């Protein structure tokens, strides 16, 4: 299989080490990082779109945020490498579009956040629903990119270990289907795959 080796680390984290979460979800982690930054003098701009990185003499001169230029001394980007490069002038980019088109990217994903008004007895916090051919699904991600014929997926029920994430007698969940990148996406397709997931979850 052409599945990236990184997934071995993910499996080891799940089954070898175990996974953890903040009591109130990962929003707690974000808030803690923001509070720490503010204590060190960091100023945050949220809901601001960065559309361009301007370069002069091989050095970043300024960035364009919400249509306005802002001077800066240093840029540290946590975004995807390809996306960050797309904000630079073409002559300042390390790789061209031909290079990126030749790369094998990690999968994208289709995510559903779902609430159940009943308890599901046969699921745990982490669930890998791999009830069909793994190799076929992998081929439909990497070799012949298309929407999976019979998707494998990951199901996460935080309410199994943290009752605060759902009302009494209910469950909180999200479902993740690994998919190829650059697929045509629309509501009809999403609805179709949601139905596929729900039909499988009815067995639990």
Language-model features and meaning:
Residues 32, 36-40, 49, 78, ...:
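Generic, well-ordered alpha-helical scaffold segments in large soluble proteins
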Residues 154-155, 159-204:
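FAD-dependent oxidoreductase catalytic-site/capping-region signature
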Residues 1-40, 47:
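Active-site/ligand-binding neighborhood in enzyme catalytic cores
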Residues 7-11, 85, 101, 139, ...:
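Generic detector of well-ordered alpha-helical segments enriched in charged/polar residues
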Residues 51-167:
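Mid-domain catalytic core of redox enzymes
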Residues 13-21, 109, 178-186:
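Glycine- and acidic
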